[in-house]
Amino acid sequence: MEVKQEILTPMKVEKTNGNVPTPPPTTTTTTVMDDDLFDDEASPPQPNKKLKAENGSIKKLTPTPKPAPVTPKPTAAVNGKKPIPKKKPVDSSSDSDSSDSSSDSDSDSSDSDSDSSSSDSSSSDSDVPKKKPISKIPNKPSGTVSKTSKNSPKTTTTTTTTTTTVKSKPAPKVKPEQSSSDDSSSDSSDDSSDDSSSDSSSEEEKPKKKPSKKPAAVKKEITVKKETTTTTKKTPVKKEVEVKKETKTTTTKKVKKEESDDDGEDEKTTTKKKTTTRKRKLKEEEEGEEEEEEGVNKWWDKEDDEDDGTKWTTLIHNGPVFPPAYVPHGIKFMYDGKVVKLTPKQEEVATFYANYLETDHVKKQAFKDNFFKEFKGLLTSEQKEIVKKMDKCDFSHIHTHLKTKKEQRKARSKEEKDAETAEKKKIQEKHGFATIDGFKEKVGNYMIEPPGLFLGRGQHPKTGMLKQRIMPSDVTLNIGEGEVIPPSPIPGEKWKEIVHNNTVTWLAFWRESVNGGFKYVWLAPSSKIKGQADRKKFEVARGLKNCIGDIRKGYQKSFNDESTEKRQLAVALYLIDFLALRVGNEKGEDQADTVGCCSLRVEHIKLESNNTITLDFLGKDSMRYLNTVQIREDAYKVLKTFVKGKKPTDLLFDSLTVTQLNNHLKKQMTGLSAKVFRTYNASITLQKELDKMDTKEFQSIDEKILFYNRCNREVAILCNHQKAPPKNLAETMSKIDEKIQELRDLQDLCRIKIGKTPKSQQEDIESREAERLPKLIQLAITNKKDKDKEKTDKEISFDVKAAFEKSRTLPDAKGKIKEKIAKYEEQIKKQEILKTGKDELKTVALGTSKINYLDPRITVAWCKKNKVPVDKIFTKSLRDKFPWSDVGTDYIF
């Protein structure tokens, strides 16, 4: 098919995102160009100057006769000339050292793509070639294909069209000058595109004839659609030819010519651009993730066991974030029925107490007494004459105000929530990361604790006391020497002190007002420093297995030593080893009465018959430790001598101190401590319990997870990791039972249809089904999701009913119904496993041992061996905490 065509070269050709040249309609075209005919998204360099035809006149559009279809011969070049290589435009955002002009789509893809998401033009004003007179290009030879840029001025043509399908012979592959940024353009030389014209600076010289390219050397079916378009107004240049490339291995490609002045064309183009933009964004995100992965400090792959005390060489951070200043609400505080006007500081403290009115804390006398003492300390002498008793204080109005604010917060719009999330993310990006030795690390607790009332754990004697507001003048920063000191975020305040101590890992610290203890800003658990400490801890515990036998022989031998001190040391070590007790420290009168092994009193132990003892005391966090256990006979006899003649409040190990015990442990093995004993016993217990799994009994993933949790439960019991049963446990169990009953009803409905269950049961099933639908509707209305906020109750009811009926629709085929029955059986089993797990673990906390005492490599090896996804056992935070735990299936603690 011979194609004759007049083409006016536009003054500037923009990028076309890698679209390949395609055969245009068989037309003879004359263009008229002015400033109003450009695409909004493809503005020319000088939009206020009009373009004229070469001779300054306007030519009429002349349709060409309809030619007979012919088969063009493939050509790799035009008139024997090779394609003109593209010159890379000057781009300040591109890599300055890139010398290959054909690689700009690779080196600058992130910059050009981001620009093109909002506009097709990615060049700055300085990159735009000067306008040149438009000259006529000679007609191309038969079989060649011309191409117009997407950003060229529009041309409206009156065309006589034909549709021809041809099969081209294989042509030599042409090396791409630029790879497209589209997803479909990376794997074919067809997409090498004559885009070189869009970046070429040759327009500043003499316009050159554009070489045509044929598709790659594969057999293709090319369908060329030619359409007739007519207009009586301005005649824009025809839009870019779109190439829709098949992603499969087929060699068929469809080339469409877009209509030039169709009313819906702009919408189509916008949609396509949006789709391309989304693809680009996804691609950029993937590349970003890869770059982030490449930037991860895989310190665990480096052999560096030396420890000279230096924790870091360079340290940069922006300091902690302080809570916002208090904003007074002006809600009245009542005393004995009368209003007492409060200052902002007094009102703030009163609001702290009002926040706990509906909790168990206000039921504790110590909480109320301590608060009232703090509150009275803020009152003036005149106010103290009025406010004398806590029982007459009325905080209910403030409490109502707080509840209203809470409801308002829940009712926030999606836009408000998004804005708040964006603000938090902005703060996190600034303060939530530190740069250590060139690596970006997360900061754990970068928020300064806000003021409030101290709660404490268990029966803490200081519960209810006021936690004062922390200011920058209370905070000491630790930062690299010579680094920029972050400014104080509160005007008029200065940091207490700036230090450069590279032998510690904290970033900031201050002293809290209640107990006088220090609070620190640490790096996150996923950081290198924390990870190294964790791995070292587990390696030390793992090494204990090599000498645990000798240590045990040593303390067992000392049970009968003449020295009381040695006998007490031996029995204490035995209890720490056998029962995984904490070492225990002496506590002051103003601290909670929690004890460990060395601080046990006679009242905490009861000697039963048959070498059995019962220990009953408050452990860490005031959690009760109650355990009746049979011990060694020789240890039992020695304990009897320790108890004899002592009062209940006397120490059981009165000749032993924590320092003596720790010093003895260090002599047994480097790094050994009571905590190492707990870590060793916890990890070895998990290892032994997991090794007991019968793969025939536990086959599904859910069954294996239940088995793992049971093993973890044994460790939690050993370490006394308890928790109070959830308050809504009964409700949760009831919901699981209802779900199981529903699944069984659905099974029976399937069986009734195939005649496996008597229809007499159908009435009971339908009765329960009738009760379920209203409940589901009410639940959906009560718990509206953000996407359903605009829907009426009637619309939600309709949607729920439709979904309910759809879920109850049964197929006609008997085989399909049997498949449904089997599927329901799997779901029933899953719910039963869930119920069993919740019941068994209702008073046991599994998380504490996973975080602190269980070598994560044991779990990873077990998961790999039994084909259980690690994320079913470890949360994301735990996976981030233990990146070094990726081991093979043969790992043994």
Swiss-Prot record:
**Residues under site feature: Interaction with DNA:** R409, R457, W506, K537, T594, K620, N662, H721, K739
- Decide whether keyword Repressor is in the record: no
Cross-referenced Pfam families: Topo_C_assoc, Topoisom_I, Topoisom_I_N
PROSITE patterns xrefs: TOPO_IB_1 (PS00176), TOPO_IB_2 (PS52038)
Which stretches are tagged as biased composition: Basic residues?
208-217, 271-281
Q: Does the keyword Nucleus apply?
A: yes
Q: Which family does it belong to?
A: Belongs to the type IB topoisomerase family.
Q: What is this protein called?
A: DNA topoisomerase 1
